[in-house]
Amino acid sequence: MALTTKAMNSFLVAAALSTCATAVNVAVDGIIVGRFVSPDALSAVNLYSPYAQTLSIILLLLLYPASSQAAYFIGERNREKAGSYISTSLLSILVAGVLLSAAAFVFTDSYVNMICYDDDGAIALYLHTYFRIVGSGTLLFLLAQFFCEIVNIDGRPSLGARAIAISVLCNIAFDILLTAHLGLGVAGSAMATLIANTVTVVFLSCSHIFTKACSFTIRIFHQFSVSALKSILKLGVNMSVTSVFSAVFIFVVNFSVQKCCDEDGLFALSIGMIVFNICVNLAMGVGRSVVSVGGFLKGLRDWLGYRHVVTRSIRVTLLIGFAVSIAVMSGARLLVRTFGADTPEMVAYCTDALRVFIWIVPSSMLVTLMMFIYQAMMNLRLIPVPTVAFSIAEIAALLAWPYFMPSETLWYAFPLSALLSIGIIYLVSEIVRHGDNTISGLTHIPGHTDDEDVEQLHLSIPANKDDMYLSLKSIRAFLDSQDISGGLGKKLVLCLEEIFLNINEYAGLMGKGHCYDVIIRMERDGILSVVKDDGRPFNPLAVEEKKRGLGLEILLGICKHVDYQNMYGQNLLILQFSYE
């Protein structure tokens, strides 16, 4: 369990960074244009968000369902099928990206007229410039997200995090250069975003995706599968419906604030939505860690580890949500000034508005996470419920509020309706559960599965010889209690002893505070043993035959089915023994 937590943390950071990359880049763009162009330029950058939300429909439809299923097949050690899902997803995203890039360029005027309350003002002019450039680079954005996701599910989250860090730094550097020093205004900010996405695509392509380091081969035409596409779309349609509602929600938010709260209100909303988008994307990153790490654990039939991942993800999400809300509430005045508020009246108004609006964050993060938890469980009925409930509650509140309450109090509608949506989600989940006590409320995770009916042993062992030999005694006692031949139990213990010794010697664990996790499952047709460690990459199966020691020769002679993977920064060795 210790290494399950470590894998979760490792993936969570990388996934959160990759999902937040766009929101962080928008925040950087906003600060730069707000300070070096005008506050109206910041509002224009924020008005790009409905289109950005629309792009998430493509990711939810074609990328995330494919990655969750690929993660499951990687867990089952079926790399060919994982490659088929990824290749199918990539070809679909390439087609969608080309079409959307062309459409964004051609229909820029239509978008500006639709989204701006005053389509002849300064905000509309800034938005026209920003949208035409960034929208034309839609394909680059989709590819950057695709490559980050694939690197993460292939067990290299640190590489994805590195790519995102480089991308954000490039965006900051080119934002300052093009916008502040060369005076290109919002056009410079938009070009900096395209450059950052290009850097991400090139870096990940050259360092992992199309190299031998990738554990599966991507051949978009050879491995394209109609059946895989149908499976992706079946799951993706339920998820993408949620993004449609989210896009409508963002449109209504911008329209309502423009109508009720004038330019200062739109400026305050722009800052609030930047923080909101970063936090929601953080929750998406946590959710993707549930889908990928959890999907991998489900493939291994490790339900104990899966429940641990889900519980931890909920705690982390709520902690981040409340921490951000408290921090923004405390530093709202400084935040408003940082984004370029230039009069005392504007600072005072935006500070008060932001302190109320920000409490939408904890509820919205939990709502986002719940969608991914339902996706990981393949619960098609509940996948759309969280975001649809949230969007409908917010839209209804924003449209009705001015008729019953003063317009200046509109900001209170955001957190109150977000809380209402949590209640709606819980109510719907209880209706779907229909009194079934075998699954948990809200998350719908099974309290018990058929996979857990088999006898199994889970151990976390400190990487030292004393604890190693004590654990071998525990394993031997467990095997002796099972209805198997004594010889088979001795063979498994002998193999595990050899593996532990090799891990300590070659993976650099001994005396350094490391550990390894061991799972032994008494399955119907044999014994499955999984050994995980967090040392440096070490594959005993890759040792040349003439260089193998006696212990390794014995291990490979006794156990005919041995598989090695390096996933999420950990060595994973899987041994299968037949009862025959």
Q: Residue spans of the language-model regions?
A:
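Conserved short strand/loop->alpha-helix "switch" segment adjacent to the catalytic nucleotide/phosphoryl-transfer site
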Residues: R476-E497
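Small-residue-rich hydrophobic transmembrane alpha-helices
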Residues: L42-A102, A144-I153, P157, A268-I326, ...
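Short alpha-helical transmembrane segments in multi-pass integral membrane proteins
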Residues: M1-A15, A70-G137, H181-G236, G294-W359, ...
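Short runs within selected transmembrane alpha-helices of multi-pass transporters and secretion channels
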Residues: L63-S67, I133-N152, G160-N171, S189-L204, ...
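Helix-terminus/linker motif at the lipid-water interface of multi-pass membrane proteins
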Residues: V24-S43, V112-G121, L177-L184, V244-I274, ...
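Flexible, glycine-/charge-rich segments associated with ATP-binding catalytic modules
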Residues: G441-L459, K560-E580
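Glycine-rich/acidic phosphate-handling loop/turn and adjacent ATP-lid/helix
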Residues: I527-L552
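Transmembrane helical elements of multi-pass membrane transporters/channels
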Residues: S10-D29, I133, A144, S167, ...
